[in-house]
A protein has these predicted regions:
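N-terminal secretory signal peptides and thylakoid transit peptides that target proteins
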Residues: 52-78
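N-terminal secretory signal peptides
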Residues: 1-62, 84-90
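Glycine- and small hydrophobic-enriched segments that form the cores of compact globular domains
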Residues: 74-87, 92-94, 126, 154-158
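Short glycine- and hydrophobic/aromatic-rich loop-to-beta-strand nucleating segment
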Residues: 190-191, 293-296, 300-301
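Secondary-structure end/capping motifs
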Residues: 303-409
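Short, glycine-/small- and polar/acidic-enriched structural segments
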Residues: 94-235, 239-242, 251-268, 274-288, ...
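Conserved C-terminal helix/tail region of periplasmic/extracytoplasmic solute-binding proteins
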Residues: 382-457
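Ligand-binding pocket segment of bilobal, Venus flytrap-like solute-binding proteins
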Residues: 153-155, 244-276, 297, 329, ...
């Protein structure tokens, strides 16, 4: 068929290869043909439409059955709810067009999870993308959320559950938000006060006071999961309070808390200051778990498609650089200064290289203590939503897969990861295990029901 037949027609089959044999793939074929036709704008839109439909329906038979069932107009309306199709068409038409808003403010919390965002300023990634970005150090997550919602920040470093919570109106007014990139995986730890070094069994923690960075954080959900698996009810047997990361070590030193599940360099700084020890890395709870994310409102994405693409591309390229272990010391020097993390370089190096003192007299070598994989797996979002539901933050029925698709923009990540020289996965969901228990993203309600300790009926 012609590469430009209507992808919203149930009668059309979308092939997977280049028809003329002169291009490496169908997308290149389509783009080249669009440039050669008399109406490139209209045909360019068709390229975008086909790309979107192929991403949503990898099996063409499923696309055709869907269109026969609901019709093209209903399909267009449904897709527009979670994908800015008009903005994508405009961005394609403009190509590497004018950046709508070159001067930006992006908020961040001074933790190593924000490494790709922070390093993009001193190491020139934003500048090479044609952007003048002011990365603004911010005190805590509630402030990040409020400043972003009030449009004081154009985009922000957020905890990966936050865009989901904001979109659903949990803890704030509902505003559609997006996560086009995960900032880091792993990179957190449970740290206890030195006085508790003989209490390594979580069943001994009854009555402990713990800090987490925010109510809507992977830290809160992992701590709750961990203690519940050891028989403690996180709402009744321990106390969990939200404390901004820059204040955690001081609270541990002052004996206001017994420990925290926190991002780095907070854990390593507690060891450096001699007030705490690292009980365990969160990678040993869930290997490869997401933590923080690059987030922007859907309004920003729609109104500034070229700016959004340039910003995300810069962060993806920084992420690709950060994935290589040989670059970690250079990155540590770039992000340690006072205007960024405000930490001794040795503390940041221990986190990024994975060779670190644990506070118990040992030097551990864990190269993937923190890593950087930007792909926003839909299954990550679904797991987070199950924990929101499990602990009573999310009420009523929820279409887990729909929310995941709307917020975690896997299609955008795939394209820009390729441009940055990374290899994105071929699927958007996967099974994984948390403390040995498999999570199937296709069965979220059964997963919630399987837990003995929960706040749901």
């Amino acid at each position: 068929m012609s590469a430009f037949k209507d992808p919203f027609s149930a009668e059309v089959k979308l092939g997977q290869g280049c028809e003329c044999g002169l291009h490496t793939d169908s997308a290149t074929h389509d783009a080249d043909l669009a440039r050669r036709t008399s109406d490139p704008e209209a045909l360019g839109s068709r390229v975008v439409d086909q790309a979107v439909m192929r991403a949503l329906f990898p099996q063409d038979g499923a696309r055709r059955r869907f269109l026969k069932a609901v019709g093209a107009n209903t399909a267009l309306a449904a897709i527009a709810q979670f994908f800015p199709l008009g903005a994508a068409r405009e961005a394609f038409a403009q190509g590497n067009g004018r950046i709508e808003k070159p001067n930006l403010k992006v908020g961040f919390i001074p933790i190593t999870c924000a490494t790709p965002i922070i390093m993009s300023q001193p190491m020139g990634y934003f500048g090479r993308a044609g952007l003048n970005v002011d990365v603004v150090k911010t005190a805590g997550w509630a402030v990040i959320r409020d400043k972003t919602l009030n449009k004081e920040y154009d985009a922000a470093h957020m905890l990966s559950p936050m865009p989901l919570a904001i979109t659903l109106g949990i803890g704030s007014r509902p505003i559609p938000y997006t996560t086009p990139a995960i900032e880091n995986i792993n990179g957190q730890a449970i740290t206890l006060a030195i006085k508790h070094k003989d209490k390594r069994d979580p069943r001994q923690w009854k009555g402990f006071k713990f800090a987490v960075p925010f109510d809507y954080s992977i830290h809160n959900y992992l701590l709750r999961y961990f203690v519940a698996e050891h028989g403690l009810d996180p709402d009744r047997d321990i106390q969990i309070r939200a404390v901004p990361p820059p204040e955690m070590v001081a609270n541990l030193r002052a004996d206001n808390i017994d420990g925290f599940l926190a991002p780095d360099p907070v854990n390593q700084r507690a060891v450096y200051d001699g007030v705490g020890f690292i009980h365990m890395l969160t990678k040993d709870i869930w290997e490869g778990h997401p933590c923080c994310a690059f987030a922007a409102s859907r309004e920003f994405v729609t109104q500034n498609p070229n700016t959004y693409r340039a910003l995300l591309k810069a962060i993806m390229e920084a992420t690709a650089f950060a994935t290589r272990p040989e670059n970690r010391k250079q990155i540590a020097e770039a992000i340690a200064p006072a205007n960024y993390l405000n930490q001794p370089v040795t503390v940041v190096e221990q986190v990024l290289t994975g060779t670190f003192a644990d506070g118990l007299g040992n030097v551990q070598k864990v190269p993937n203590r923190i890593d950087f994989d930007p792909f926003p797996w839909h299954s990550f979002a679904i797991w987070i939503l199950t924990q929101m539901k499990r602990w009573g933050q999310l009420k009523g029925d929820v279409d887990y897969a729909k929310v995941a698709r709307e917020v975690f923009l896997a299609t955008d990540a795939t394209r820009l990861m390729k441009e940055a020289g990374m290899k994105p996965p071929s699927a958007t969901s996967k099974k994984f295990s948390v403390m040995g228990k498999e999570f199937d993203p296709a069965r979220p309600d059964a997963y919630i029901a399987s837990f003995a300790i929960k706040r749901t009926a």
